[in-house]
Amino acid sequence: MTEHGSGPAGLTPSAAVPLDGSERFAGVDATVADFWRWVCGDLRENTTRGMLAEFLVAKAVGDPRALRIGWDNFDVVTPDGTTIEVKCSAFLQSWPQPQGHSAIVFGRLAAREWDATRNEWSVDARIRADVFVFAVQTQRDPAAYDVLDISHWEFWVTSARTIREQAVKTVGIGWVRQHATGPFPYGGLAHAIHTAAQLH
């Protein structure tokens, strides 16, 4: 008898069903919204802010997927199939900053690729998307930091070809200003991505 989780046939997950937050857990007095609030309640936190940046880009281009796929080889996809990697940075953090503002840095531009059909990572780091978006939360005053105000964001866009030609893995805002186009306000992001996609 083949044990659960082994064997050549493998396992295929059932389709994910989007939740609306009102659902209640069995065995604990809590809703899915309670869980979301606990996990993502502070949109200044690094991981959460990065996912917010991905969400903003997804909304801008009309990503047809109903749910974020955390293990995918790109962050966002457009309706025409252009794949996008979103990198996020900010001057302010959710913790005390005795040394002042954080430097604007974007890392892991190239990363090992996950092959879900073979259940393995690629040996070498690769540029995995057609377009890169560098999202910067620009607020510098902690008292004025409004996590819901999208005008506090600016976006820079470049093609994957530029990343490959420059052979960079981590870049600062100086590199972005020199080699990417922008900064764009949120309203100009979709057009900028479409333009960069022609160059990848």
PLM features: what roles do these ranges have?
Residues 1-83, 87-200:
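Nucleic-acid endonuclease domains
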